C-alpha cells in the first residue's frame, strides 16, 4: 500500500473542511483535503445552500466590513438594523428548544463576526440579501430576522472561493478520495486509509495517509437510507435528499469505530416540503428550486 504524509489531514470538502484547511495552513502546517466527490460535484452540502450566513452585527460599519463594495447611496437607502449576541443566543435556544450545546453555542455566537471577517480575508465576497431578507418601506429597504449577508454566487460561489484560496496556499485537494478507516491507537488518531477513485469507479487504489492531526468534516448521514431509518424512524428511507449524494455517514461511522463518543440529537433533522418529481439527491443545476415552502 502506498503511503504519503502530511501535518493535517482534513476529511471532507465543504465549507467547514475548507476553512479548517485554511486555518491549519495559516499556522504553517502542510494540509491534504480529501473530497469524496469529483471536481464537478465537490463541496458537500455547502454547494447546495443559498450561501446565507448569520452573524452578530452592531451597526452598519460591521456590514460594510463584510461588504466593502456597498456604496454610500446603498447604505443611505437601507436599514440593516442590528443583530446582537443576545438575539443570536435567543434564536439558537428557541429554534432548538434549548437543546443546543451551550459551549458550542457561545463559541458560534461570540466568534461569528470575527469568523466572517476572516472568511472575507480569504477571498469570499459577501453581499446583502435584498431579494429575500428586506422589504421596501417608504422608499427604504428594511432588513428583518437578523440575516443580512450571503456569499456572492450562493453556496457554489462560497465553495469556489474557498477552493481558490486553498489552491493559492498550496493545500492539496484530492478529489474522488474516500476515507475508509482511521489509523489510530491508544495515543490518538494518526491518519486514514483512503480509496482513490479510478475511471469514475470507487473501486480504486487504496493508500495510507499519515498525519499529525486529522479533522473530520465529512458531513452527516442524510444520503444513507439505512442510517436515516435507524436514527430518524420508519419511512425516512424513502425521503428525497436536498443535498449531496456523498454524505453517507462515513465520517460518523469511522469516528465511532475509532472510539469516539456519540453525542447530540440523532433523531432530529431539518426537512422541508420538496417536489414529488425531484430526483433522489440534489441537483446542482437546479439548486434549492425543488423546495415547496
Regions found by a protein language model. Name each.
Residues 13, 57, 218-219:
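Glycine-rich, N-terminal phosphate-binding loop of Rossmann-like dinucleotide-binding domains
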Residues 200-204, 209-281:
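Glycine-rich loop(s) and the adjacent beta-strand/alpha-helix scaffold that form part
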Residues 26-46:
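Glycine-rich FAD pyrophosphate-binding loop
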Residues 102-205, 224-227, 275-277:
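Conserved redox-cofactor binding core of oxidoreductases
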Residues 24, 275-293:
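FAD cofactor-binding and catalytic pocket of flavoenzymes
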Residues 2-16, 32:
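Beta1/beta-strand and adjacent pyrophosphate-binding region of the FAD-binding site
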Residues 47-85:
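N-terminal glycine-rich dinucleotide-binding loop that anchors FAD/FMN and/or NAD(P) in oxidoreductases
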